[in-house]
UniProtKB/Swiss-Prot annotation:
InterPro entries: DHquinase_II, DHquinase_II_CS, DHquinase_II_sf. The keyword Amino-acid biosynthesis applies. GO terms for biological process: amino acid biosynthetic process; aromatic amino acid family biosynthetic process; chorismate biosynthetic process; quinate catabolic process. Homododecamer. PROSITE patterns: DEHYDROQUINASE_II. Catalyzes a trans-dehydration via an enolate intermediate. Pfam families: DHquinase_II. This is 3-dehydroquinate dehydratase. The active site is at Y23 (proton acceptor), H100 (proton donor). Its EC number is 4.2.1.10. The gene is aroQ.
Amino acid sequence: MKRVLVIHGPNVNLTGKREKEVYGEITFEEINNMIKREAAKLDIAVKIQQSNSEGEIINLIHSAENNFDAIIINPAAYTHYSLAIMDAIASVSVPVIEVHISNIFGREEFRKVSVTASRCKGVITGFGPYSYILALYAVKFLEDSIGG
């Protein structure tokens, strides 16, 4: 069974309560339940964490080494400027998939830049909460394609 660390960045815990026109009405708890249900179907064990703190997110990324087979991360606002999170992603050997609920490329100019994406295996953006589900399938695909 593959082990995946899911990291939600700042303010993701308010999904369903804030900017519903951007992030939708589904709640943070509902997103996590969706992730757990789909992961079980794919025979993937998930640990879900959320932090509003850059340092805490970095520590979570570091903790994945030798403990998880992949990371799914929504860096949220840190996507656009956190070189520290980018460096943390680069420092681990496990594949990292960046996800976003909204399409960051269809939003404000500053949101169209992802400094973290360059260190990720791939990016899934704009599919609402299903971005996380698609990322689980990407993890499964990576597993199958490398014979793991």
